[in-house]
Amino acid sequence: MEPQQQQQQQGNEQQDSQGIGKINNGSGGSSFLCRQSSTRWTPTTDQIRILKDLYYNNGVRSPTAEQIQRISAKLRQYGKIEGKNVFYWFQNHKARERQKKRFTADHHHHMNVPTIHNHHYKPPPVYNKFSNMNSGSFPSSSNGSPGFLTTPGSHVGNYGYGSVAMEKSFRECTISSTTDANVGGSMSQNIAWIGINNEYHNPYTFIDTRKYMNGYDQTLEIEEEAEENYTAEIETLPLFPMHADIKQDTADYFNGRLENGCPRASLELTLNSWFGNSKYN
């Protein structure tokens, strides 16, 4: 019994001192098997320095069983160490390096994502289809397009017909205080057209718009002719319009003479005839 116990004790001591390894050539990798010990390894500063030098400078990432034995034999000069401690140190160091690279990649990815703040947000532009013009205001038109010019006491309403397209832009046509015109709404006194606002297009075709434009121009021409005729009639009326209803079929007596039908007699002759008729009546 004693020789068997001595042989078993010598085998255990030899295994602890040399750190017997087992190489798995079939899988292409290496694994190191050793007897587990209850004591925890506390590496010294020199041991850590040698291991980092092998890992970073010499490029040793996955050492084989022979390399682990040589490394552990060298490190025992600086403190207590086993072969399994060398094996696990390289495994843990590789895992930490992979985790560090993954964290760095995720950090750069989040840094490249643009962040949108509230002060960077710009609301879309809002265009008012129905423009209201207050009295005494001078609305400005963008992009050089002409608009309305209103004077105090005026009001223009637009009820969904869009902007009136005029062929002759910047055409002024003043309207008297007693004349009212409907151009998509109501227009009062002291309003002048100075242009058009082409910001919104007519939803109808160009042909319909052209017809409407021509009809509008013809309406303006008819109004101008009516104003000229009205002015001419005012100039030819007699000074006293109340005598215009007097019929000229009766005889007019003046200065001892008889004349029939004198529509354009002078004021003196008209008065004499009127007094003469009243005397005989």
UniProtKB/Swiss-Prot annotation:
Its main location: nucleus. Residues 1-38 are annotated as: Disordered. SMART domains: HOX. It holds the Pfam family Homeodomain. One of its GO terms (cellular component) is nucleus. It is found in: Nucleus. Gene3D superfamilies: Homeodomain-like. Residues 1-25 have a biased composition (Low complexity). Residues 36-101 bind DNA. GO terms for biological process: cell differentiation; flower development; plant organ development. Coiled coil: none annotated. It comes from the Eukaryota. GO terms for molecular function: DNA binding; DNA-binding transcription factor activity. InterPro entries: HD, Homeodomain-like_sf, WUSCHEL-like. Keywords: Developmental protein, Differentiation, DNA-binding, Flowering, Homeobox, Nucleus, Transcription, Transcription regulation. The keyword Protein transport does not apply. Transcription factor that plays a central role during developmental processes such as early embryogenesis and flowering, probably by regulating expression of specific genes. Required to specify stem cell identity in meristems, such as shoot apical meristem (SAM). May induce shoot stem cells activity in order to maintain the stem cell identity. Belongs to the WUS homeobox family. This is Protein WUSCHEL. It comes from Antirrhinum majus.
